[in-house]
């Protein structure tokens, strides 16, 4: 009987210690979670200059430039990630972003090369598929392929509501 009491008591203590440890680890993770919202582009550039292989920060900075349509600042960061990152998801995303920037500069063939390489690395990349679908849907010779790609993209449960609505709007304009 005492074995069972000791065993039960030991298990209870173990569960309490485990719970406390998990709580402490969660608090520590929250403490060290990096929030870049209050970090300036200049500060990020400085950190990246000193630590060129800090790919997540480099990607965050490139995305800021991309969102501001400052492609000349975004491109070197995406290129660095595409050439140096071992993370296929980051590499694929960087290539897709490069592909879109190249498309925006009216170089369709090079743009589709980057997007196809992005998809070769990560065949599930919604960004690369979306960009390729948008490019193809505007080309009368590839419009059906573009429609097919975009229709497959909107089926994904990983797509944000805003992105889904944007793609649905494009499809509605071209399916008329």
Residue ranges of each PLM-predicted region?
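Long, contiguous interaction/recruitment modules in multidomain scaffold/adaptor proteins
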Residues: 1-50
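Terminal, low-structured helical/coil segments at or just beyond the last alpha-helical repeat
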Residues: 4-18, 144-176
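TPR alpha-solenoid repeat register
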Residues: 57, 91-94, 128, 163
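Canonical tetratricopeptide repeat
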Residues: 60, 94-97, 131, 166-170
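Alpha-helical adaptor scaffolds
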Residues: 63-121, 134, 138
